[in-house]
Amino acid sequence: MADSVMMGSGSLNSGSRSGSSKTCTSPTENYQLARRRTLQVVVSALLTECGFDSAEKAVVETLTEMMQSYITEVGRCAKANCEHTARSTPTLSDVVITLVEMGFNVDTLPVYAKRSQRMVITAPPITNAPVVPKSLTAGQKRTHPAHIPSHFPDFPDPHTYIRTPTFREPVSDYQVVREKAASQRRDVERALTRFMAKTGETQSLFKDDISAFPLIAAKPSPIPYLSALLPSELELQSLEETDSSEQDDQMDNDNNTSHIMQDDSGADKENEVLPPGGVVPSGKANEENMIDNPYLRPVKKPKVRRKK
C-alpha cells in the first residue's frame, strides 16, 4: 500500500518536480517553493485516497491553489478575530469561530481525522523563514518599559529617530555670488525683452517671417529734452525727505516757542516795555524774517509718512 501511494504521489508530482529543477538562490523563493511542494504532496495524497491513479499537472496546480487560498483565508480571519479581542496571537477558539463563519461543520472534523484510509505523509524538511537584512543600523534598540505590556509592538529602529537638515548654508564665495547675480540679471533682461516684444509693437528683420527675431519698436519722444529737465525718482525722494524733516523741525521750534511764551505771559503783562538790555523773543524775530511776498516763500509740501 505504501509503495502504491508513493508511486501515485510521485507520478502526480513529476510535473512539478521537473518544472522546479532549477535551483533558486534567494532564500525567500526557496521557502515559498518548499511550502508549495508540501501542499502538492497533500493534494496528491487526497487524490490517491479518492481512487485516482494519475492526474494532469494543471489539475494538481488548480487544487493546490484552492487549498492554499482556503488556508490563507482561515488564517486571515483568525487573525482578525484575535485582534478584535485585543490579542496578538490567535488561539484555537479563533480558528473554530472562523471555520463556523466560513460554513464548515466542525463536528465532522474528528471523524475525518480518524478515518481508516488515512495516508501518513512524511514531515517536510525544516526550512527557516527568510530573515530580512537590516541595511541601516544605528544605536541600540529600545526595549519596553515596565508599564508597557510585552505583546505590544516593538519600538522602531533607532535610525528612524535620526534627522538630517534639508537646508544648505548660503554661498559666500565672491566669484560664485557674482556669477549667480549676473545670470539672474541676464534672465530678467531676457524675460523683460520677450514680454515687451509680445505685448508691444515690434519690428521684424525679415519680411517673410514676422515672428522671427522680433525687435522692440523705438518710439521717438515728442519732446526729447523733457527727460533732462525733469528730476529723477531718487532726487524727488531725497527732496521729499529733506522737506519733511525741515517741516518737522520747524513745527518743533514753533511748539517750543509757544510753550515758552505761555509760561512767561504772567511776567510780560506786568512789564509791557522791555528793559534796555532785553532780548527780542524768537517768535517776533521769526515773524520779521518771514517774507511778505507769497510768490517768494518756499514751497510747503505735505508731510510724507515713512513706512516702518
From Swiss-Prot:
InterPro entries on file: BTP, Histone-fold, TAF8, TFIID_su8_C
Role according to the record: The TFIID basal transcription factor complex plays a major role in the initiation of RNA polymerase II (Pol II)-dependent transcription. TFIID recognizes and binds promoters with or without a TATA box via its subunit tbp, a TATA-box-binding protein, and promotes assembly of the pre-initiation complex (PIC). The TFIID complex consists of tbp and TBP-associated factors (TAFs). Mediates both basal and activator-dependent transcription.
Span of the annotated motif Nuclear localization signal: 295-308
Family: Belongs to the TAF8 family.
Acidic residues compositional bias, start-end: 239-252
One GO MF term: protein heterodimerization activity
Skewed-composition ranges (Low complexity): 8-21
GO terms (BP aspect): cell differentiation; transcription initiation at RNA polymerase II promoter
SS bond list: none
Region (Disordered): 1-29, 239-308
Superkingdom classification of source: Eukaryota
Encoding gene (name): taf8
Record's keyword terms, sorted: Cytoplasm, Developmental protein, Differentiation, Nucleus, Phosphoprotein, Transcription, Transcription regulation
KW Aminoacyl-tRNA synthetase (keyword) present: no
SMART domains according to UniProt: BTP (SM00576)
Organism for this UniProt entry: Danio rerio (Zebrafish)
Phosphoserine: residues carrying this PTM: S26
Domain Histone-fold: 37-104
Subcellular location: Nucleus; Cytoplasm
GO terms for cellular component: cytoplasm; transcription factor TFIID complex
Biased composition regions of type Basic residues, renumbered to the chain: 298-308
Protein name according to UniProt: Transcription initiation factor TFIID subunit 8
Subunit comment: Component of the TFIID basal transcription factor complex, composed of TATA-box-binding protein tbp, and a number of TBP-associated factors (TAFs).
Keyword Metal-binding: no
